[in-house]
């Protein structure tokens, strides 16, 4: 297996399709990117036991090779997540014996092993760069493709920054540097979570009371709008960011940034100011919430 005590730390960023060329031309990504075609199948029980537990189980095919991956529910927010992850090569089918030995399946989920079946798929092309930034090594990937859940489809168009060595603070620093020129924004939803929501046709929004919770709710609403194309989620996001900007508990030093976020809302797909403000707020507010 990949390692005995795995931890994946990454920052996920949504990217408008029209701005792909800005990524490819960015001066921090001058080296040619490796391009990989990845076909992924996610598994769960008919009643969604893994999804409810915040577990993602997939087979990833790249050429003639197949990897089996298990990811747990993470902690973080504002696009940043820290999750346990196990990954190892298999012969093309689920390795149930190895699954049974993993912590998530040793107790409550052990009975799910005989009921696992494919529930959704993601197919995308991944372009990958290794970036040295502020003394850290970061893998930056650009994923383009689609999520398929039954007849439903959603577009994958995102950047992921994964810490390979160094300090997690460098992920924020690199994202903020990219956001100076690229209209990206934090994304709160993993591909597996997006697929599960797409399958159900439901995109629940989290309750909010504190400034960090309002930011989280607004970002989740934008993710929901992207996949559902329901404009009510766009209105929900704007309402959440309005509540954040006027919140009495918001640090006064952050209020101008929250207002800048709100002011740039309607031009967020072309103007970098929205994403830069969202990243700055997410970093400073240090959102801590369970992720799926």
Where are these regions (language model features)?
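Phosphate-end processing signature that detects enzymes handling 5′-triphosphorylated RNA
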Residues: 1-292
């Amino acid at each position: 297996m990949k390692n005995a005590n795995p931890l994946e730390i990454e920052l996920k960023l949504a990217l408008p399709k029209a701005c792909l060329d800005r990524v490819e031309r960015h001066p921090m990504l001058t080296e040619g990117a490796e391009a990989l075609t990845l076909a992924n199948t996610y598994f769960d029980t008919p009643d969604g036991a893994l999804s409810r537990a915040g577990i993602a189980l997939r087979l990833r095919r790249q050429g003639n090779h197949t990897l089996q991956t298990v990811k747990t529910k993470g902690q973080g927010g504002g696009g940043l997540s820290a999750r346990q992850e196990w990954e190892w090569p298999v012969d093309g089918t689920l390795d149930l014996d190895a699954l049974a030995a993993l912590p998530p399946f040793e107790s409550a989920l052990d009975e799910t092993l005989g009921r696992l079946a494919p529930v959704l798929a993601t197919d995308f092309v991944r372009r990958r760069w290794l970036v040295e930034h502020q003394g850290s090594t970061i893998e930056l990937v650009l994923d383009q493709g689609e999520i398929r859940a039954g007849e439903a489809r959603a577009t994958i168009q995102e950047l992921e920054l994964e810490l390979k060595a160094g300090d997690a603070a460098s992920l924020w620093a690199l994202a903020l540097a990219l956001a100076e020129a690229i209209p990206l924004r934090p994304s709160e939803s993993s591909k597996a979570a997006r697929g599960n929501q797409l399958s159900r046709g439901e995109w629940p929004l989290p309750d909010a009371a504190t400034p960090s919770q309002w930011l989280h709710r607004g970002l989740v609403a934008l993710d929901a709008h992207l996949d559902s194309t329901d404009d009510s989620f766009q209105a929900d996001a704007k309402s959440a960011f309005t509540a954040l900007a006027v919140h009495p508990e918001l640090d006064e030093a952050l209020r101008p940034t929250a207002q800048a976020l709100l002011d740039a809302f309607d031009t967020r797909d072309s103007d970098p100011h929205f994403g830069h403000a969202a990243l700055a707020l997410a970093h400073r507010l240090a959102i801590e919430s369970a992720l799926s």
